[in-house]
């Protein structure tokens, strides 16, 4: 993918949070949105990450030097894609409804721990999803038992989660 209009949204978010916006940089990483796409196999994911190291180091040097990131060109394609995704797709389709565990769930709670929105709570040894999901796929792709699924869209699919 590309950054689309992420700069526009990041700039608004920074202003809302009282932070200075210094730009953004798109860095290709392995796909993990397995509700719609296919994640790469482990070997391909490693290669994608290997290729990402140089742009990450460049971003770090810009940050370390307190320099702005280069301005990202906003194309009509970016406007259409990002506009459609953020204005139509997100409100209509991005929901926690449909997340569930299979009998393979070991009740470890890792899904709840990985959720950046704290949208998953454990009731006994079972995860329960709230309503604040952004579909980051961390709960699905980070599950050690591969027991978290989203509707029927993720069954049997390769999972990718970058461990820290």
Where are these regions (language model features)?
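A mid-sequence, solvent-exposed acidic-amphipathic segment
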Residues: 75-107, 113
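Active-site-proximal loop/hinge segments that shape catalytic or ion-binding/gating pockets
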Residues: 160-163
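Aromatic-enriched hydrophobic runs in primary sequence
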Residues: 31-34, 69, 88-90, 110, ...
């Amino acid at each position: 993918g590309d950054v689309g209009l992420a700069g526009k949204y990041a700039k608004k978010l920074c202003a809302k949070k009282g932070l200075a916006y210094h730009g953004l940089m798109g860095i290709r990483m392995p796909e993990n949105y397995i509700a719609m796409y296919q994640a790469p196999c482990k070997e391909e994911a490693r290669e994608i990450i290997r290729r990402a190291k140089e742009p990450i180091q460049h971003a770090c040097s810009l940050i370390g030097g307190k320099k702005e990131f280069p301005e990202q060109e906003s194309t009509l394609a970016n406007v259409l894609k990002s506009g459609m995704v953020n204005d139509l797709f997100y409100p209509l389709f991005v929901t926690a409804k449909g997340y569930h565990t299979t009998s393979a769930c070991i009740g470890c709670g890792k899904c709840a721990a990985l959720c950046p929105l704290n949208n998953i709570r454990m009731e006994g040894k079972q995860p329960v999803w709230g309503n604040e999901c952004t579909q980051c796929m961390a709960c699905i792709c980070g599950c050690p038992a591969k027991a978290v699924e989203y509707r029927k869209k993720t069954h049997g699919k390769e999972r990718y989660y970058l461990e820290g």
